[in-house]
């Protein structure tokens, strides 16, 4: 199965294009989500302009802030009983989280000033 993604394929400014992307293999611990909305973040713009200050493993799909609906659950996810088909979900991303910081150890990594 394939989908369309906005792919940043090199560090050169403007090296972004729509590409067909093959779905990864689906495993027992995985969830398939139908994306309903994606936002453009400052880091996406930095990559578009080639001005990012972090290491990137090209090619990379842009648009890491998104929401949607669960369409498929792996066997282990189903048995855990926390998620159901049709649940509305959002993503939360961070490039760097210090798992040893006091805030991270309390489950408040989103408040850690070292988070990037």
Labelled PLM ranges:
Residues 43-49:
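Cytochrome P450 core scaffold surrounding the K-helix E-X-X-R motif
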Residues 24-38, 51-102:
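Glycine-rich beta-strand-centered segment in the early N-terminal region that forms part
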């Amino acid at each position: 199965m394939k989908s369309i993604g906005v792919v940043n394929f090199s560090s050169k400014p403007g090296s972004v294009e729509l590409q067909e992307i093959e779905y990864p293999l689906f495993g027992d611990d995985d969830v398939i989500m139908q994306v309903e909305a994606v936002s453009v973040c400052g880091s996406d713009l930095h990559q578009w302009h080639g001005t990012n200050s972090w290491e990137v493993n090209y090619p990379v799909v842009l648009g890491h802030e998104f929401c949607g609906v669960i369409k498929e659950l792996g066997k282990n996810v189903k048995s855990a009983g926390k998620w159901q088909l049709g649940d509305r979900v959002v993503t939360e991303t961070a490039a760097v989280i210090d798992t040893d910081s006091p805030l991270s150890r309390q489950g408040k990594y989103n408040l850690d000033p070292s988070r990037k």
